[in-house]
Amino acid sequence: MIETRTTTSTSEIKHDNSLKTGFEITKEVEEFRNYENSEDRVSEAYRNSHTYQTYDYATEKKKQYSQLDTSIKMGLWEAAELLNTIIDESDPDSNIPQINHCLQTAEAIRKVYPDSKYDWFHLTGFIHDLGKVLLSKKFKEQPQWATVGDTFPLGCKFDESNIFYEFFKMNPDYNDSKYNSECGIYKKNIGLENVTMSWGHDEYFYLVCVGNKCLLPKESLYMIRFHSFYPWHRHNKYTHLTNEEDEKMLNWVKEFNKFDLYSKDSEPVDVESLKPYYQSLISKYFPNELHW
């Protein structure tokens, strides 16, 4: 387990399942994550993801990207600006550039958690999707299916709570006897740290944070790494793989999801007015030059 400092006990969380979010939601809660009426681009992104995201593929990608490229040096704000031209094709709730979503998430968190002791939480909201830079020309425009969308464990049976579950039937791992039992290649309650997740922006940016020795607390790293793992934090699935540490962090991941999902708005954000605050947090938690 990667050691990081923890700044706030999980008992301090104000998680509220009633969805009294503390910030304005621009549409009905039931209208979010509506995949039945989503555009064709959304189902196509998941068709490709569920077909091509195999255990071997994800293992190879993690090995490739964990060796950070020292020739790519870029600050977090510069990375965020790369998202100006990127649309997440797997997202039925947003068709605006990703930098707007990042700042909408961060500002919603900041409204509910204004105290400076939660500044790490504000920053997490801003940076959580920066792994989507993989879609940019700077990173050779990696395919959407290998970058965005809900994440899921590989090396074990696909759970039916996964969105567009039927597409997994085209995945080579679906009928592989090594992988199609409940635990597959893993021991029960092995812990998510030891589970190979589908490859994408979550896992990639987690590797960037850890590889650059950022100063974010453990709660933040869990949010970054598992915010797209909806079968776990929304449907309480795959608990046969989680351990005590994962369960301690689950409420934080759920709390983050409230802001990540329900703060989405088609109205653009005044990026320049917010830039000084988030740059100050970047300097605090990412003091070193960043490699990607």
Curated annotation (Swiss-Prot):
GO terms for molecular function: inositol oxygenase activity; iron ion binding; oxidoreductase activity, acting on single donors with incorporation of molecular oxygen. Pathway: Polyol metabolism; myo-inositol degradation into D-glucuronate; D-glucuronate from myo-inositol: step 1/1. It is found in: Cytoplasm. Keywords: Cytoplasm, Iron, Metal-binding, Oxidoreductase. It holds the Pfam family MIOX. Its cofactor is Fe cation. Its EC number is 1.13.99.1. It comes from the Eukaryota. Transmembrane segments: none annotated. Fe cation 2 binds at D129, H201, H227. It comes from Dictyostelium discoideum. This is Inositol oxygenase. The gene is miox. It catalyses: myo-inositol + O2 = D-glucuronate + H2O + H(+). Belongs to the myo-inositol oxygenase family. InterPro entries: Inositol_oxygenase. GO terms for cellular component: cytoplasm. GO terms for biological process: inositol catabolic process. Substrate binds at R33, D88, E89, S90, K132, G149, D150, H227, S228. SUPFAM superfamilies: HD-domain/PDEase-like (SSF109604). The lineage of its organism: Eukaryota, Amoebozoa, Evosea, Eumycetozoa, Dictyostelia. It is an enzyme of class 1 (oxidoreductase). Fe cation 1 binds at H101, H128, D129, D260. Binds 2 iron ions per subunit.
